[in-house]
């Protein structure tokens, strides 16, 4: 549609309905907003999950370390109880006081948390002490134990006072009491390992307050902590460990801050991206309107318009061109050479012209050619090709305008018919060349037969003929006759129509036969044929004559390519080698090579690089190779020339022939 509002007077602005104007809901524009919300949600969930994971891991570690501290302290208290029980048993067994004191001193030296050991008789009188001196804090416990008259199964603990606890053990039911005083702060100081002390403060407390504590620095009230009942052995007490502030708190805070900053940056980037997307969409809308205007102008033309890139692939066609060739734009755009509207009779000429466009300078050109419509009819057209230059000044392809000049080219069609007649004559000349080659091959054995026959007649004329020499002459005549017959049979097998026969085939023998057939042609064009067989070549299942036909065709093509174009050497080498589960035959010539324009359609029918070629040889060769489940490919040769590679599979062991 056209919009005449706004802009200079008389100017018309082309718009496309639905592309410009307000949009009620633009789902694509909401994608960045959804991404922003999703990103913020994911970052928040990640931070929460990391914090929860760290907290759970810290709680689990705190509980584990608390259990370890509890077991360590309980073990040490058990050691003190065990010493007290042994001293009581020794005293009841009648051990001397001197021996008991010596054992007590040994225990005190090894366990400094045990402040002293004392013995009381059945009346509660102190009879010995290590170190010497009374212990008034334990008198009440001793009287209580003696008054009960019972023999407890384990030492009895008294109350904790000033960080000390007294434990007592009866010597016997009628005997005295052995008493030990243990310092809880000293026990914490001595028996807590350094790695616990570096991470935690340890405290033993009851309802009255802290009884003993070890902490290398003040502990915050909100610090993580874990408490475990320490009753028994100490009645009403609790063992508690408290974590210091995490040393990597600053690192965690920095990491979280970095994540938050990156999240903010990502959000800002998405906001900017969202705004840029909106501006870009508005620009795209304007561009679509401009393209619609230009498309309307192009579709109004009666001249066919066609754009293609440097390789010949079609980029654009207008309606007039589609009507010209009878094909839809969808069938043409993106299509590579050869084009469906190319006339088969002019395929070689068209390919040559495409090569000139690719290899030549980007200057305008004009030529006439023939197109084939989709209904099979052919039309004569005149094409004007001009370089397609992009906004950066680079040559991107060619823009062509095509005009139908069928009615004006009746005379040209007659001339082309004459050209086709000349082409058929050229093919007959090729057959004549084959006859010449056959005559050359037969000339040598026939001349040898004549020579041996003359020698045999001379031997017969002698008075006493040498039968041995005569026999040798006849044998050589037979060999030369077989050689001549082999030449005739080889050519006959090569040209006659026959059914393929697959059998075990020695490729080295087939290669030798192919080289012998093409040797005269090579000598005529001063080309040196050479074979290179690498390693042991396994046999393949193939038809001997068909594979020989492929090799002869490829070798002959290489020789003729070296004869017609500029060559980079005089050698044509055929290399036979094994490549994994296949055998490769490489025919390497020193000709001018194959251009990119021809390479894409080299194996198509009617495609040839020779001036008199029919363009069917390589297509037939590929069909023969594919019939043997192989492949035929080509590529450039190092130093100049072309390499054609035939790949044939090697039958697996046990596979049917």
Curated annotation (Swiss-Prot):
SUPFAM superfamilies according to UniProt: ATPase domain of HSP90 chaperone/DNA topoisomerase II/histidine kinase, Homodimeric domain of signal transducing histidine kinase, PYP-like sensor domain (PAS domain)
Lipid bilayer topology: Multi-pass membrane protein
Single GO molecular function: phosphorelay sensor kinase activity
Phosphohistidine sites (modified residues): 440
Keyword Membrane: yes
Gene Ontology BP annotations: regulation of DNA-templated transcription
Record protein name field: C4-dicarboxylate transport sensor protein DctS
Keyword annotations of the record: ATP-binding, Cell inner membrane, Cell membrane, Kinase, Membrane, Nucleotide-binding, Phosphoprotein, Transferase, Transmembrane, Transmembrane helix, Two-component regulatory system
Periplasmic domain ranges by topology: 52-252
Organism placement in taxonomy: Bacteria, Pseudomonadati, Pseudomonadota, Alphaproteobacteria, Rhodobacterales
Reactions that this protein is recorded to catalyse: ATP + protein L-histidine = ADP + protein N-phospho-L-histidine
Annotated transmembrane regions: 27-51, 253-273
SMART domains: HATPase_c, HisKA, PAC, PAS
Pfam families the record matches: HATPase_c, HisKA, PAS
Region (Inter-domain linker), start-end ranges: 407-422
Gene3D superfamilies: 1.10.287.130, Histidine kinase-like ATPase, C-terminal domain (3.30.565.10), PAS domain (3.30.450.20)
InterPro entries per record: HATPase_C_sf (IPR036890), His_kinase_dom (IPR005467), HisK_dim/P_dom (IPR003661), HisK_dim/P_sf (IPR036097), PAC (IPR001610), PAS (IPR000014), PAS-assoc_C (IPR000700), PAS-like_dom_sf (IPR035965)
Enzyme class: transferase
Occurrences of domain PAS (ranges): 289-361
Residues on Cytoplasmic side: 1-26, 274-657
Organism of derivation: Rhodobacter capsulatus (Rhodopseudomonas capsulata)
Record-listed E.C. numbers: 2.7.13.3
PAC domain: residues covered: 365-417
Physiological role: Member of the two-component regulatory system DctS/DctR involved in the transport of C4-dicarboxylates. DctS functions as a membrane-associated protein kinase that phosphorylates DctR in response to environmental signals.
């Amino acid at each position: 549609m056209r919009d005449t509002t706004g802009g200079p007077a008389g100017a018309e602005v082309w718009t496309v309905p639905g592309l410009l104007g307000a949009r009620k809901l633009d789902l694509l524009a909401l994608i960045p907003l959804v991404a922003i919300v999703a990103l913020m949600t994911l970052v928040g969930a990640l931070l929460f999950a990391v914090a929860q994971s760290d907290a759970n891991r810290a709680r689990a570690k705190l509980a584990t370390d608390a259990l370890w501290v509890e077991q360590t302290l309980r073990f040490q208290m058990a050691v003190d109880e065990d010493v007290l029980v042994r001293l009581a048993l020794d005293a009841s067994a009648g051990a001397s006081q001197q021996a008991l004191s010596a054992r007590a001193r040994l225990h005190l030296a090894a366990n400094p948390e045990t402040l002293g050991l004392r013995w009381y008789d059945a009346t509660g009188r102190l009879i010995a002490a290590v170190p010497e001196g009374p212990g008034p804090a334990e008198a009440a416990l001793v009287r209580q134990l003696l008054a009960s008259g019972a023999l407890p199964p384990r030492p009895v603990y008294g109350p904790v006072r000033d960080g000390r606890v007294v434990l007592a053990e009866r010597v016997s039911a009628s005997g005295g009491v052995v008493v030990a005083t243990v310092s809880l702060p000293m026990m914490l100081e001595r028996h807590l390992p350094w790695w616990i002390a570096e991470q935690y403060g340890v405290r033993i407390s009851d309802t009255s307050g802290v009884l003993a504590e070890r902490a290398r620095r003040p502990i915050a009230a909100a610090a993580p902590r874990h408490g475990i009942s320490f009753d028994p052995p100490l009645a009403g007490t609790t063992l508690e460990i408290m974590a210091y502030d995490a040393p990597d708190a600053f690192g965690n805070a920095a990491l979280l801050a970095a994540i938050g900053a990156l999240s903010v940056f990502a959000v800002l980037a998405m906001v900017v991206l969202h705004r840029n997307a909106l501006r870009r969409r508005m620009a795209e809308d304007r561009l679509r309107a401009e393209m619609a205007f230009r498309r309307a102008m192009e579709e109004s033309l009666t001249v066919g318009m066609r754009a293609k890139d440097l390789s010949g692939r079609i980029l654009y066609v207008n309606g007039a061109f589609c009507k010209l060739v009878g094909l839809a734009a969808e069938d043409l755009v993106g299509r590579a050479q050869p084009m469906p509207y190319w006339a088969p009779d002019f395929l070689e000429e068209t390919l040559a012209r495409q090569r000139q466009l690719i290899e030549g300078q980007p200057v305008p050109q004009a030529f006439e050619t023939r197109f084939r419509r989709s209904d099979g009819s052919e039309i004569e057209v005149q094409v004007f090709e001009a370089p397609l230059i992009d906004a950066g000044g680079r040559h991107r392809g060619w823009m062509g305008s095509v005009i139908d000049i069928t009615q004006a080219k009746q005379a040209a069609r007659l001339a082309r018919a004459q050209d086709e007649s000349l082409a058929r004559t050229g093919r007959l000349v090729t057959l004549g060349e084959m006859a010449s080659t056959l005559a050359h091959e037969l000339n040598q054995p026939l001349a040898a037969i004549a020579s041996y026959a003359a020698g045999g007649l001379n031997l017969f004329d002698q008075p006493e003929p040498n039968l041995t020499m005569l026999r040798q002459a006849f044998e050589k005549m037979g060999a030369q006759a077989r050689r001549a017959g082999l030449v005739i049979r080889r050519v006959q097998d090569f040209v006659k129509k026959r059914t393929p026969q697959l059998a075990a085939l020695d490729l080295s023998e087939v290669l030798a036969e192919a080289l012998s057939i093409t040797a005269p042609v090579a000598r005529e064009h001063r080309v040196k044929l050479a074979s290179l067989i690498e390693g042991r070549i396994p046999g393949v299942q193939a038809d001997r004559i068909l594979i020989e036909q492929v090799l002869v065709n490829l070798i002959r093509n290489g020789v003729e390519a070296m004869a017609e174009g500029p060559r980079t050497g005089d050698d044509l080498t055929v290399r036979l080698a094994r490549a994994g589960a296949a055998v490769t035959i490489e025919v390497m010539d020193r000709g001018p090579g194959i251009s990119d324009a021809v390479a894409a359609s080299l194996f198509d029918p009617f495609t040839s690089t020779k001036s008199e070629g029919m363009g069917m040889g390589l297509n037939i060769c590929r069909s023969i190779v594919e019939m043997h489940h192989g492949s035929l490919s080509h590529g450039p040769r190092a130093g100049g020339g072309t390499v054609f590679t035939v790949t044939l599979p090697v039958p697996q062991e046990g596979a049917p022939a």
